[in-house]
Regions:
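Short glycine-enriched loops at secondary-structure junctions
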Residues: 3-7, 112-114, 162-165
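Short, charged, surface-exposed secondary-structure boundary motifs
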Residues: 9-12, 57, 169
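Short gly/ser/thr-rich secondary-structure transition/capping motifs
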Residues: 25-28, 150-152
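Phosphate-binding site of ATP-dependent enzymes
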Residues: 31-32, 39-45, 49-139, 149
């Protein structure tokens, strides 16, 4: 991927360029704005703008003092923006990684299914990866994003979809190609090299 694109797009924020596909989202450092967002949705996810692998992602279903302390810490006492999104119950069925290679969605995806009692499907956080065929909705979202990726010389990306919602666009080091190959014998990396 073009290094300029890696500098231009924050992976957590990039998805907001496609508001028609994302869950309700707030990017803010203001405790009052985060509180109002929570009051509107009653169950939210909060995460830093620079995290990976499921680290520092919290589900907030009560604005008790413990959760407010976490928010204060994550926002560095309201100096650092974080991303807040309405919680998507479909996450328990899988956080799907869809690879977009040379402007085309790969036909197999990886459903990262959270371990019991957790909501994080990230493999690094203990989730289990299950390869599946891409759905029509996933393909539609990927095809809408692909032209922007191509225009910015991003030839290998991994988008994350939970239920019907786009949650992230990963362009730095998208994972899950190995798991897809191991389970389906279809090789995303081979597909990537065909386009070079």
């Amino acid at each position: 991927n073009n290094p300029c694109a890696l500098k231009k797009f924050n992976e957590k924020v990039f998805a907001t360029d496609f508001p028609e596909f994302i869950p309700k989202t707030l990017i803010s450092s203001s405790i009052n704005k985060i509180r109002a967002f929570f009051d509107s949705h009653k169950k939210i996810i909060i995460k830093p703008l620079d995290g990976m692998g499921g680290t520092s992602i919290y589900k907030v279903d009560d604005l008790n003092e413990d959760n407010l302390k976490i928010i204060r810490t994550m926002t560095n006492s309201e100096k650092t923006q974080i991303i807040c999104q309405s919680f998507i119950e479909d996450v328990y069925e899988g956080d799907f990684r869809i690879l977009i290679i040379n402007g085309k969605p790969f036909p197999k995806t990886l459903a990262r299914i959270p371990k019991d009692g957790d909501f994080k499907g990230n493999l690094a956080a203990g989730g289990k990866g299950v390869a599946k065929d891409i759905t029509e909705n996933q393909k539609k979202i990927a095809e809408a994003i692909a032209p922007i990726l191509v225009k910015n010389e991003i030839s290998f990306a991994g988008i994350d979809i939970v239920g019907k919602y786009l949650t992230e666009i990963n362009i730095t080091s998208p994972t899950c190609a190995r798991e897809i190959l191991d389970q389906t014998q279809l090789n995303p990396i081979e597909e990537y090299f065909k386009g070079l």
